[in-house]
Amino acid sequence: MIHDANIEKLGDHFIVCGYGHMGRAVVDQLNRAEVPFVVLETSEELYRELLEAGVPAIHGDAKSREILLSAGIERARGTCIVIDDDLENLSITITARSLNAKLKIITRAGQRCYADSLRTSGADEVVIPEYLGGLTVGRMIRSSYPTQAILV
């Protein structure tokens, strides 16, 4: 485990688990909103990229209690679990909830069938990117038709 000593000073922050496509978008939004956060990432290459960009990060597996504790989960406001693996997200959700009962847990589900399991395991919010993308495309299509045509 490698991390920045300043992470130990964080409180009321968010822990972002995963720095893939979705994790990058989350980090961008947190930076814009000036929300304190730390990223947990298993990839050495992505971890180094985070450090070079000055992003607080820990190189390690978010399924590990020790890694979550080193990220300050007991002092955190919430966690955003956006790894592209439903079973890993489920495992992290269970561990995170066991370490902080008040933690806001937002997690990703690649498949709708995992959403209920994630909620039952402690997730407060479950995001299904492909489903949300479908809703957005559907709205775009509907907006190209007159309102009365939709109200059939």
Language-model region placement:
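Cytosolic regulatory regions of ion transport systems
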Residues: 1-152
